[in-house]
């Protein structure tokens, strides 16, 4: 195999004797110069962590090409949002449509009005019948540039006691995934009833398995595990 090596011109002009047993490296083994990651890449990678965090719904307050108002849409799935546990029967990969109406405010940031639409296969909390739980809900959030100088943390800052405000340092993006996840989960459990007639009636007890064995709704199984510890 033909092998080549690189020798510095400074080495040729010096008086240092080069050993005849010099190991030659093929060009394929020469490493390329690594480029520094951008701040956004660093945030996505968790500040240098080898595990990449996949973000789905993001907005940047420093995006310069947008002015005034604009709209954007995201098409994801319950599995993408890690909400497949909400599905009680059927495929756990229902589509989720997230529409964002964004307005830029001079020297402030972005105000975002979001709308979430999806359908989840659920069991009625009254009659236990399967039904499609239609989700059509909205949220509002402000994305503001952060003025803090704390560089120790590489993740965007969340707005303290106000969950409707997200502070983001220059060069970073606001991650709206958790906001969308919480909105869907709370809306799903808020009124888990299949019809108006069930809403006006009393809950019905259904026996599962042996009549002397208590059954636990899987939605509360995690609370039961914590109680037993």
Swiss-Prot record:
May play a role in synthesis, processing and/or stability of 23S rRNA. Residues 1-42 form a transit peptide. GO terms for biological process: ribosome biogenesis. It comes from the Eukaryota. Belongs to the DUF177 domain family. Coiled coil: none annotated. It is found in: Plastid, Chloroplast. InterPro entries: YceD (IPR003772), YceD_plant (IPR044985). This is Large ribosomal RNA subunit accumulation protein YCED homolog 2, chloroplastic. It comes from Arabidopsis thaliana (Mouse-ear cress). It holds the Pfam family YceD. Keywords: Chloroplast, Plastid, Ribosome biogenesis, Transit peptide. GO terms for cellular component: chloroplast.
């Amino acid at each position: 195999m033909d092998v080549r090596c690189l020798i510095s011109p400074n080495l040729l002009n010096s008086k240092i004797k080069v050993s005849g047993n010099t190991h030659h490296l093929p060009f394929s083994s020469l490493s390329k110069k690594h480029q520094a990651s951008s701040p956004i890449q660093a945030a996505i990678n968790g500040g240098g962590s080898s595990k990449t965090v996949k973000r789905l719904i993001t907005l940047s307050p420093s995006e310069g090409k947008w002015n005034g108002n604009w709209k954007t849409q995201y098409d994801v799935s319950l599995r993408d949002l890690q909400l497949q546990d909400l599905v009680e029967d059927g495929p756990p990969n229902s589509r989720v449509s997230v529409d964002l109406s964004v307005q830029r405010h001079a020297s402030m940031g972005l105000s975002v009005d979001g709308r979430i639409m999806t359908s989840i296969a659920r069991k009625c909390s009254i009659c236990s019948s399967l039904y499609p739980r239609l989700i059509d809900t909205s949220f509002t959030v402000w994305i503001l540039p952060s003025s803090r100088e704390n560089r120790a943390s590489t993740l965007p800052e969340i707005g303290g006691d106000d969950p409707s405000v997200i502070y983001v340092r220059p060069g970073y993006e606001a991650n709206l995934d958790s906001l969308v996840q919480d909105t869907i989960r709370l809306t799903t459990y808020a009124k888990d009833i299949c019809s108006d007639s069930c809403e006006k009636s009393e809950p019905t007890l259904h026996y599962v398995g042996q009549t002397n064995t208590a059954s636990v709704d899987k939605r509360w199984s995690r609370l039961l595990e914590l109680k037993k510890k």
